[in-house]
Amino acid sequence: MRDIKTYLSVAPVLTTLWFGSLAGLLIEINRLFPDALVFPFFSF
């Protein structure tokens, strides 16, 4: 039971950090390359 409580308290923190960093990354990409349909660093 204690392991379940530990998991339920750790998982929301990790998902919040993950989605927060993902949102920040997407915001910075859109700031550097506004309205880009093809990103320059993906083209070969």
Curated annotation (Swiss-Prot):
Membrane-topology annotation of the record: Single-pass membrane protein
Transmembrane segments annotated in the record for this chain: 7-27
GO biological process, one term: photosynthesis
Keywords: Chloroplast, Membrane, Photosynthesis, Photosystem I, Plastid, Thylakoid, Transmembrane, Transmembrane helix
Stored InterPro entries: PSI_PsaJ, PSI_PsaJ_sf
Record Pfam families: PSI_PsaJ
Coarse class of the protein's main subcellular location: plastid
Coiled coil: none
Subcellular location: Plastid, Chloroplast thylakoid membrane
GO cellular component, one term: chloroplast thylakoid membrane
PANTHER family documented for this protein: PHOTOSYSTEM I REACTION CENTER SUBUNIT IX, PTHR36082
Similarity comment text for this entry: Belongs to the PsaJ family.
Biological role stated in the UniProt entry: May help in the organization of the PsaE and PsaF subunits.
Protein name: Photosystem I reaction center subunit IX
Source organism (scientific name): Liriodendron tulipifera
